[in-house]
Amino acid sequence: MYRRLSALVGDVNPENLLGQGDAGLRSIGVTRQKSRYLLALADEVVSGALDLGLLDDLTVGDARDRLMELKGIGAWTADAYLLSALRFPDVFPVGDRALQVGTAEVVGLDTVPEPDELELLSVPWRPVRAAAARIIWHAYLKRRGRVEPADPTADREHTPPGPA
């Protein structure tokens, strides 16, 4: 999706998203609901109601709470943003199914842990649970034959990390 979005708008930023509007976003497969959420988020940033730069100065919990105040952003999306975009070191998206299954596989559990169980399992990995999440995601994808060899020419600045 990111590649399609980038092809549509060029530099993915709030102004360019607003410039495409709903029709542009829908033309690349963004659902009506997600288009509304994206455009509302872009509008919040452009209007100054949301300053994403200030999230860096907050705790993980406060930054997550601020993001989740926005319509369409739940815990998974907030955690993914904090982990991938802001690179907070102690984010562990316990609601992520691949992370739940991957953790069960990596630590040898018979059942897939629920989010509250996964939170407890991740405590020993503090304060670098984001690194643990990336390792577990990689193991999850590798077990399923979905890890592609690294491309040394890839533009790492614009390729979002995390599972496909």
Regions found by a protein language model. Give the residues of each.
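Alpha-helical ds-nucleic-acid-binding substructure associated with the helix-hairpin-helix region
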Residues: 1-71
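C-terminal accessory module of base-excision DNA glycosylases/AP lyases that mediates lesion recognition
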Residues: 36, 56, 60, 75-164
